[in-house]
A protein has these predicted regions:
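A short, amphipathic beta-strand motif
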Residues: 21-27, 53-55, 90, 102
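Hydrophobic beta-strand segments
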Residues: 37-40, 68, 104
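A short, solvent-exposed loop/turn motif at the edges and junctions
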Residues: 69-80
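Surface-exposed, low-complexity/disordered segments
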Residues: 91-297, 303-307, 321, 374-482
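Short, acidic Ser/Thr/Gly-rich low-complexity loop/linker segments typical of extracellular
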Residues: 45-55
Length: 482
């Protein structure tokens, strides 16, 4: 399996027909990144840089004949011809005089009139057909370890002593980051609450920020478990009066006998299940993005459909790319958790962009030494015209912050039914004192939308055979050819 994986990586790295690359947008004076800048092409496709000013230029988005336009509030816009564009950094020049962008019109509408018009034209403006969406979905998880202590540690496994565990926990990386990206066809059917997905390709990238000592201790722990635990054991976990039980399985801890057909069949079944679970997970996460759309009655971004719950600022007219738009600030009157800024096309009253941010904690939980809080969520949704002059979701970006802490005793008890004597084999006990904070970033880009018939939707086979390829570092040619 390792040889096959290595061969795949080699083949990918030598395929040099058209490379994707990461580009950073910075302030030409301060050299600070320019977050959430607008990047669009002459073919009307567009993306937005992330909070670090980064975006990925993927061949699927453009042709060599296209031009690249970059703009951000407070900076002079820039334009490039893609057939000669080879830079990895774009420098935007700050505007020398920052004046309020005011457009004079003889048809000045109030914010409430604009919101009412948005409601009136929702069915006309947005694509509610059954659609096939070719999209790129990226998830980034950043975690900072604030505390990890195992107090009163006891173990019957000879190599797992309190001293060795202290060394291991002291050398855990304080910060970690991993990314998961996938390209897929995602099928939306508004008539049923069951989308479909066909995965094309996926990759996972982790930061290699662990120290050599931490790695060696990890190897020592694995070696100790392999030598002291039996592969046919099971375990029970107890935390106070809360018991749990399950099969003792550690992926890769015990070698598979290539001559044992039962083990090989079990391995194949686990592989099929992993692929199925991965596709189900990706489909559910993408579905949660689409359900966030403002025209979904159950969305928390209900600035339009539940406009009575919000206070709206006076509208301002400005340009978003080449479009003249109304900009309206939204602030909740009572219990709603989000404030927002909506951008409404002045011609057809379609919402083309929504920026949102929470103003209240999203959730809190504290019970029996376990506490969890979700205290941050901010993001952006962009809607663009694809086929039939209808708007569909084209871009989504979201950041969510969580805090978790655990202060609880626990026991892990190894038991085995296949040995003579008592079932209990080993026991580990300790009092866990753990705290961490995390930021979960999500980004979705839609490259193409096309309507399909009901019969085509029903015939879609969801037998996905894709698992993410693990890479230790970012490779710019991974998405080549896709």
């Amino acid at each position: 399996m390792k040889q096959i994986y290595f061969l795949l990586v080699v083949l990918i790295s030598f395929n040099l027909k058209a490379q994707s690359k990461k580009i950073k947008i910075i302030d030409s004076i301060s050299f600070e990144p320019v977050p959430f800048a607008t990047i669009f092409f002459s073919n009307n496709n567009g993306i937005i840089s992330d909070e670090d000013g980064l975006f990925e230029l993927i061949p699927e988005q453009y042709s060599k004949k296209d031009s690249l336009f970059v703009s951000s509030m407070g900076f002079e816009p820039k334009q490039f011809s893609l057939d000669i564009f080879n830079d990895s950094i774009i420098r935007l020049v700050p505007k020398t005089i920052s004046l309020k962008n005011v457009v004079v019109t003889n048809n000045q509408l109030s914010s409430n009139e604009i919101i009412d018009s948005v409601k009136l034209y929702i069915d006309k403006n947005y694509n509610f057909n059954i659609t096939e969406n070719k999209l790129f979905f990226r998830q980034e998880f950043n975690q900072e370890l604030e505390k990890f202590k195992l107090n009163k540690f006891k173990s019957t496994i000879k190599d797992l002593t309190a001293e060795s565990m202290d060394r291991m926990t002291d050398n855990l990386p304080k910060k970690s980051k991993n990314e998961l990206e996938s390209l897929s066809y995602y099928y939306v059917n508004s008539n049923i609450d069951a989308p479909k997905i066909k995965l094309i390709k996926s990759r996972r990238t982790n930061d290699d920020n662990e120290s050599d000592l931490s790695k060696s201790l990890g190897d020592k722990l694995e070696k100790s478990l392999r030598e002291n635990l039996k592969s046919n054991s099971y375990f029970k976990i107890r935390s106070g009066w809360l018991p749990f039980s399950g099969d003792l399985t550690f992926n890769g801890l015990w070698e598979i006998d290539s001559t044992n057909q039962d083990q090989l069949n079990k391995l194949k079944e686990e592989e099929v299940k992993r692929k199925e679970n991965f596709s189900i997970g990706q489909k559910g996460r993408i579905q949660s993005v689409y359900l966030k759309s403002f025209f979904n009655p159950n969305s928390e971004l209900n600035f339009i459909l539940k406009s009575k719950n919000y206070i709206f600022s006076d509208s301002e007219l400005t340009y978003l790319g080449n479009e003249l738009v109304y900009v309206i600030e939204c602030y909740p009157k009572r219990g709603d958790k989000y404030k927002g800024t909506i951008y409404v096309n002045s011609d057809d009253f379609a919402v083309v962009r929504i920026d949102y941010e929470n103003i209240k904690p999203l959730s809190k939980f504290k019970l029996l030494g376990v506490s969890f809080s979700s205290n941050l969520e901010k993001g952006r949704m962009v809607f663009s015209k694809f086929e039939n002059e209808k708007y569909s979701l084209s871009y989504y970006q979201n950041s969510r912050g969580n805090n978790i802490s655990i202060k609880r005793p626990f026991k892990i008890i190894e038991k085995n039914k296949f040995v003579k004597g008592r079932k209990k084999q080993n026991q580990i006990s300790a009092k866990l004192d753990f705290a961490s904070s995390s930021i979960y970033n999500t980004e979705l880009q839609v490259f193409r939308v096309r309507s399909i018939e009901e019969t085509q939707f029903e015939e879609i086979d969801e037998k996905n055979q894709v698992l993410p390829i693990y890479l230790e570092e970012f490779k710019k040619d991974f998405w080549e050819g896709f």
